[in-house]
């Protein structure tokens, strides 16, 4: 999950892991991007400012679609820097 942050303009990364009954989402960020807030708001999770996680009980595709919509909303609020 940290590897994507080595790319210069990437400020937030995510990894989705399928478990038997849910999808676990791991989030990382750098700078002022607060993935703790993101995880709490969109994935019933939490953590720290630059490292957080959550869960989804949707399918993998539905979870990814929800993530993409959520990132867009988060960006529109000016929270991606």
Task: Please state what every model-predicted region is.
Residues 1-81:
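Gly/His-enriched, cation/cofactor- and phosphate-binding structural elements
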């Amino acid at each position: 999950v940290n590897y994507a942050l080595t790319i210069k303009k990437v400020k937030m990364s995510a990894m989705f892991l399928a478990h038997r009954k849910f999808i676990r989402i791991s989030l990382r960020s750098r700078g002022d991007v607060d993935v703790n807030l993101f995880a709490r708001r969109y994935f019933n999770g939490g953590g720290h400012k630059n490292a957080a996680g959550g869960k989804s009980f949707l399918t993998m595709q539905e979870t990814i679609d929800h993530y993409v919509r959520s990132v867009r909303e988060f960006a529109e609020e000016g929270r991606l820097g």
